[in-house]
C-alpha cells in the first residue's frame, strides 16, 4: 500500500512540474536584442555557450560564483544609470531551441563594468524565468555585475553590430 501511494505521489509530482524544469537542456543559443540593433545578435558556438548555462548559480544545485552571465560573488548592486544601453538577452535550450530564461544587460562602451538585471515579480519575463529556475527574492528583481567572461564575448559583438548598423544607408 505504501509503495503504491509513493508511486502515485511521484507520478503526480512529475505531471505537475513544468516541462522546463524537467528538460534542463544545454544552452544552444543566446540572442541579444536592443533598440540600437537592427537585427538580433545570435551566439551559437557550443564552446562559447558552455560558460553560459541557465541551470547554474543561485536557485540551482550548483553554487558557481560566476554563471549564466553574472558575477554572483559581488552580490546585488545599485541600479545602473539610465544612460547605459540596455539589451534583452534570451537563453535558448534544447529541445526545440526554446527560450527558457531572459535577463537585461546594460553597459556603456569603455572599461566600466556592465550590469545584469534578473526580472522580478512585476517584470515581463519573470514568469518564464521561474518556470526554469526560481532564484529567489535575493536575486529576482535585482541588478548584478556582469561576469567578465560574458563581457569579453558580448561587448565586442554588440559594439561591432552597432557600428555596422550606423554606417548602413537608411
Question: What do these predicted regions represent?
Answer:
Residues 17-21:
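Membrane-interface motif at the C-terminal end of an N-terminal transmembrane signal
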Residues 22-170:
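Function-determining sites in protein domains
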Amino acid at each position: 500500500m505504501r509503495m503504491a501511494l509513493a508511486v502515485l505521489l511521484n507520478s503526480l509530482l512529475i505531471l505537475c512540474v513544468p516541462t522546463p524544469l524537467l528538460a534542463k537542456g544545454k544552452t544552444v543559443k543566446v540572442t541579444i536584442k536592443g533598440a540600437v540593433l537592427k537585427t538580433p545578435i545570435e551566439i551559437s558556438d557550443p564552446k562559447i555557450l558552455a560558460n553560459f548555462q541557465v541551470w547554474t548559480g543561485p536557485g540551482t544545485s550548483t553554487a558557481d560564483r560566476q554563471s549564466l552571465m553574472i558575477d554572483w560573488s559581488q552580490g546585488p548592486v545599485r541600479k545602473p544609470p539610465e544612460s547605459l544601453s540596455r539589451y534583452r538577452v534570451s537563453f535558448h535550450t534544447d529541445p526545440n531551441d526554446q527560450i527558457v530564461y531572459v535577463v537585461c544587460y546594460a553597459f556603456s562602451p569603455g572599461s566600466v563594468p556592465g550590469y545584469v538585471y534578473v526580472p522580478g515579480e512585476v517584470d515581463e519575463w519573470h514568469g518564464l524565468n521561474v518556470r526554469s529556475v526560481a532564484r529567489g527574492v535575493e536575486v529576482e528583481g535585482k541588478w548584478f555585475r556582469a561576469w567578465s567572461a560574458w563581457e569579453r564575448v558580448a561587448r565586442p559583438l554588440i559594439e561591432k553590430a552597432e557600428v555596422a548598423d550606423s554606417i548602413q544607408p537608411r
